[in-house]
Design a protein with these regions (language model features):
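Nucleotide/phosphate-binding catalytic cleft detector across ATP-hydrolyzing
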Residues: 1-12, 16-200, 218-220, 243-244, ...
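A conserved active-site cap/scaffold subdomain adjacent to cofactor or substrate pockets
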Residues: 226-248
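A short acidic Gly-Thr/Ser loop motif
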Residues: 6-12, 76-77, 201-208, 214-217, ...
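Short loop/turn elements that form and flank the Walker-type P-loop nucleotide-binding site
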Residues: 195, 207, 315-317
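Glycine-rich phosphate-binding loops at beta-strand->alpha-helix junctions
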Residues: 258, 315-335
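A general structural motif
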Residues: 295-304
Length: 335
């Protein structure tokens, strides 16, 4: 069975074609990354240009995999999303738990409720409580007096989803399934033990930083903040009056969130604005890192606030996994 996944990010468009077979690992038939500058904070700057780029990526992927692409699974960013944790309790008077009881609990819950201008992206039972004992598997077959279902619902703005869907409607490609972008990112880097024992995965992207929380092989939470590695690049460019190209190079080659006594003595020559005059000046490495550190602190603090907002910090999950381009910043794993 052929499956196609597409991710339209703020710096690149990605497409993967895979062959899913029973009792074996997926076989990757094609993987395409294509740079784009036509998206800013998940909004299309030029619809026609981004449509042409996506068409080009799909064509390359189809040619590379020797398949005809008619439908896709599409990643959807979750910046400005809303998460709901809710439950539903029923009394079954020491009877055997049956599917009928689960359906009753679902029907009397907020499972089918939605907010105006939002679309439900994920909505499922995260755990069960049988007489106050938490279960993560199906409780059918147990005797109990009280059954409680704990749900998680993730909603994204309809306009965002319709914008992305409309792109593929014009290309006459069917969107088979919508997938939260942080979930795709986490599944690519977390192993079975990570997902089972508990893990927080933070994806430090170019224009946003997303996070997911896994435990007992279930997604407990997904969200994102609108700050990414591009903000660090812009901070450097403004802070030392250099070009964006130079700032990106400085961040990659010299950037760190950890200070060292030698930073004061490591001198770097950089072009200054306006760049067309070809003028240069010298700065030390600590100047760059003093710009980087506050932005990284702000980003991680916003992520921490998201966890506290939904009381997820109380789960005391210790396993933290970093991914994305920003995770390559020196010292961030030890910060």
């Amino acid at each position: 069975m052929i499956k196609v996944g597409v991710d339209i990010g703020n710096s690149k468009i990605s497409c993967v074609v895979s062959d899913l077979q029973k009792n074996s690992l997926p076989k990757i038939l094609s993987f395409i990354n294509y740079p784009t500058s036509n998206i800013n904070k998940n909004a299309f700057i030029n619809f026609q240009l981004i449509k042409d780029e996506v068409r080009h990526v799909i064509t390359l992927a189809a040619k590379d995999s020797q398949t005809e692409i008619k439908s896709i699974n599409l990643n959807i960013p979750v910046t400005d999303s809303i998460s709901f944790f809710y439950d539903s309790k029923i009394e079954i008077e020491n009877e055997l738990i049956m599917d009928l009881h689960l359906k009753k609990a679902i029907n009397q819950s907020d499972f089918f409720d939605n907010l105006i201008n939002y679309e439900i992206l994920m909505n499922y039972i995260a755990s069960y409580e049988v007489d106050n004992k938490k279960l993560f598997g199906n409780p059918v077959g147990n005797f109990a007096k009280i059954l409680n279902l704990n749900f998680y619902k993730l909603m994204v703005k309809k306009n965002l989803i319709n914008t992305f869907k409309n792109l593929f409607y014009d290309l006459q490609i069917h969107v088979e399934q919508l997938v939260p972008t942080p979930l795709s990112s986490a599944l690519a880097v977390l192993n079975v033990d990570d997902r089972d024992l508990g893990a927080i995965c933070i994806d430090l992207g170019e224009a946003s930083t997303s996070l997911v929380v896994f435990e007992h092989e279930k997604l407990l939470f997904a969200d994102a903040v609108s700050i990414g590695s591009k903000n660090i690049t812009n901070d450097i460019a403004r802070g030392i009056s250099t070009t964006k190209e130079s700032a990106e190079r400085l961040k990659t080659l010299y950037g760190s969130v950890l200070s060292s006594p030698s930073d004061e003595h490591e001198i770097i020559e950089i072009p200054i604005l306006p760049s067309e005059f070809g003028q240069f000046k010298q700065i030390n490495r600590s100047t760059i890192n003093n710009i980087i550190k506050p932005r990284v602190e702000e980003t991680l603090e916003l992520v921490w606030q998201k966890l506290r907002q939904y009381n997820l910090h109380k789960r005391k999950i210790k396993n933290l996994v970093l991914t994305g381009g920003g995770s390559q910043l020196e010292g961030i794993a030890d910060y």
